[in-house]
């Protein structure tokens, strides 16, 4: 879990663009008009991890244009050098950029519409200004290499949720969405997604392309949420100066908790939504304590995969609400319950969780049950009067889908850990283990439940357990990378090509 301030820059600008969608709303039109007359708005600008990585790597050479060109090429090296030069460093102080709590930047989130058509030219100058601000934060020590490594690990966890849980739905015809998204889910299979094709240097950038898309869509969604929050505060407090209201709203935004599954869900909701106001009502369910039952229903239903002809049922329970969709082969359940519920009991009743995140004292979970039986199987069971009992500790009953997920988590955990420890092995400690465990709990909660129940018969689950519970051993080894190499010897079910791929990754990783 991270704070919104850790993954984005929350700034104000002299503009009224963000208020346009709210102008016609009944009851707040006068408030919106008054705010527009103030000519000030809030923007949430998600950080591009690629840009942060470049700036961190370039930080020792900011004043050496030749060294920057040698490291990053003449074009990117020139961009970094020019950005540094604009800050006019004098006597170790940054004269032209006062260190204020709320930065003022003439920058809005990249203009990406619902069809995800990039409009790079009109935003190029704005991108440079945000680039300047990030470089400034690095110079002030507010963004460090450790922060960037943790952010990369976080974004990889969010990418895992989006690519494995949500994006596969776009290959079906249930969404009226641009064909640009149809092949994104195939990135893991080395096919070419068409998303932001013009922004890529070459075909190897599929992964970072999707990360870039996530950052842009998340920024759009959170900027609209920040605008609605500002309107509500201004509407309810007409006596306070606008500057005080701005400060209050920005401070509240900075402290919003974001988990990988939260991030991915917001991106998915914003991509598939048809009305921004309705989408904001759903976001309010995640971030605000006051919730409308109808908005909770909308959130849970939209989290379920859209299946034509599949039955949809709701169930009010003591601890919250859940929706179930049964397509005859699998049963998906989306629930919002009290945070202190017995998770294991829900897992036994509704299946293992695919993802999970907290929403203001509540727990939102998407589960899938692969144990649905066909009519023929049910008839056989009725004839012999024997019903198999689903035991969480018994991994033998898992379908091949779980073994596939087990292999995926091995690769995902290695990459998340590699991001966290890049060039900083000596700092690997229990805090690193805690961060990794939290990322996995949100993006792959089913594996942590199995580990907690000692379900380690499957080789992949044993490896994941090893990664989760024994990461502190990294601090006790002269060569921490060996813990991964030794663990790979357990993966008997991996093919030669998969084993080779992992070993190559480990050899190249800067542990």
From Swiss-Prot:
Subcellular location: Host cell junction, Host plasmodesma; Host cytoplasm
A Gene Ontology cellular-component term: host cell plasmodesma
Domain of life: Viruses
Protein name: Movement protein
GO aspect biological process, one term: transport of virus in host, cell to cell
Predominant location category: host cell
Function: Transports viral genome to neighboring plant cells directly through plasmosdesmata, without any budding. The movement protein allows efficient cell to cell propagation, by bypassing the host cell wall barrier.
Keywords: Host cell junction, Host cytoplasm, Transport, Viral movement protein
Signal sequence residues: none
């Amino acid at each position: 879990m991270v704070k919104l301030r850790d993954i984005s820059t929350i700034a104000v600008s002299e503009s009224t663009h963000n208020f346009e969608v709210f102008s016609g709303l009944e009851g707040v039109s006068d408030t919106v008009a008054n705010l527009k007359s103030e000519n000030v708005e809030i923007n949430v600008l998600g950080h591009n991890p690629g840009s942060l990585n470049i700036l961190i790597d370039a930080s020792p050479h900011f004043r050496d244009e030749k060294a920057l060109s040698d490291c990053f090429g003449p074009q990117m090296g020139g961009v970094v050098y020019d950005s540094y030069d604009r800050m006019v460093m004098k006597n170790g102080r940054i004269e032209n950029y006062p260190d204020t709590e709320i930065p003022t930047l003439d920058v809005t989130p990249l203009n990406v519409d619902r069809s995800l058509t990039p409009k790079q030219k009109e935003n190029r100058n704005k991108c440079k200004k945000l680039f300047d601000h990030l470089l400034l934060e690095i110079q002030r020590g507010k963004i460090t290499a450790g922060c960037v490594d943790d952010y990369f690990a976080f974004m990889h966890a969010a990418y895992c949720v989006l690519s494995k849980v949500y994006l596969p739905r776009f290959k079906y015809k249930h969404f009226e969405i641009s064909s640009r998204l149809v092949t994104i889910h195939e990135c893991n299979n080395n096919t070419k997604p068409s998303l932001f094709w013009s922004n890529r240097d070459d075909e190897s950038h599929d992964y970072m392309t999707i990360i870039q898309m996530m950052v842009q869509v998340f920024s759009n969604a959170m900027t609209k949420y920040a605008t609605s929050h500002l309107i509500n505060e201004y509407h309810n407090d007409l006596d306070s100066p606008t500057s005080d209201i701005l400060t209050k709203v920005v401070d509240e935004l900075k402290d919003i908790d974001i988990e990988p599954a939260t991030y991915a869900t917001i991106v998915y909701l914003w991509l598939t939504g048809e009305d921004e106001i309705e989408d904001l009502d759903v976001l309010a369910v995640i971030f605000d304590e006051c919730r409308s039952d109808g908005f909770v229903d909308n959130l849970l239903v939209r989290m379920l995969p859209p299946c034509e002809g599949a039955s949809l049922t709701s169930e009010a329970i003591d601890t919250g609400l859940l929706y179930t969709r049964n397509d005859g082969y699998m049963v998906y359940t989306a629930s919002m319950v009290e945070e202190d519920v017995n998770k294991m009991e829900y897992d036994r009743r509704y299946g293992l969780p695919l993802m999970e995140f907290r929403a203001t004292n509540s727990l939102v979970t998407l589960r899938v049950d692969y144990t649905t039986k066909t009519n023929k199987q049910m008839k056989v069971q009725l004839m012999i009067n024997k019903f198999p009992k689903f035991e969480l500790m018994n991994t033998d009953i898992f379908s091949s889908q779980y073994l596939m997920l087990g292999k995926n988590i091995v690769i995902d955990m290695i990459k998340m850990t590699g991001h966290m420890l890049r060039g900083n092995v000596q700092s690997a400690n229990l805090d690193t283990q805690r961060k990794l465990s939290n990322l996995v709990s949100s993006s792959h909660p089913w594996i942590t439940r199995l580990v907690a129940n000692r379900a380690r018969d499957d080789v992949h689950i044993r490896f994941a357990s090893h990664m989760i519970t024994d990461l502190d051993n990294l601090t006790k080894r002269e060569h921490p990378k060996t813990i991964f190499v030794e663990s790979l010897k357990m993966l008997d079910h991996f093919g030669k090509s998969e084993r080779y791929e992992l070993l190559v990754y480990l050899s190249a990783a800067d542990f």
